[in-house]
Amino acid sequence: MSRRGTAEEKTAKSDPIYRNRLVNMLVNRILKHGKKSLAYQIIYRAMKKIQQKTETNPLSVLRQAIRGVTPDIAVKARRVGGSTHQVPVEIGSTQGKALAIRWLLGASRKRPGRNMAFKLSSELVDAAKGSGDAIRKKEETHRMAEANRAFAHFR
């Protein structure tokens, strides 16, 4: 048995302008090669574009998009008796948000467009409306979990 204590779970800090943890999570996820100022720049430009497109609070659009993309359940590969089964498992809120942010950024990177701020803003607006690649990814994950429901007892 380990003598070390359990590590305290870190809480995400909030960003300087919107004072929001989700924005900070998004910034940390979009970050490449340690260029955090560029990541902030991209996010804030995307927020401005959302403000112009929808004429609503960009934070509420972001929250709605993440709420729409967050999965409730996912599948995990589990090896049982020589064969690998996709076992459906429930996802906690923190992990669900992290997955949602990852899917939103992945979908926006695949989008055709001028720059990342434009692509991200378009994807967030689409996700808030209930369409877009990230929403499709969530639905696909839920379908996979539903199809493999028979293996739920392997948890």
UniProtKB/Swiss-Prot annotation:
> Its GO biological process terms?
ribosomal small subunit assembly; translation
Pfam families in the record, alphabetically? Ribosomal_S7
The UniProt keyword set, sorted, is: Chloroplast, Plastid, Ribonucleoprotein, Ribosomal protein, RNA-binding, rRNA-binding
Cell inner membrane as a keyword of this entry, yes or no, is no
Q: Which GO terms describe its cellular component?
A: chloroplast; ribosome; small ribosomal subunit
Query: Subunit composition?
Result: Part of the 30S ribosomal subunit.
Question: Which family does the record claim for this protein?
Answer: Belongs to the universal ribosomal protein uS7 family.
> What name has this protein been given in UniProt?
Small ribosomal subunit protein uS7cz/uS7cy
Q: Which organism is it from?
A: Glycine max
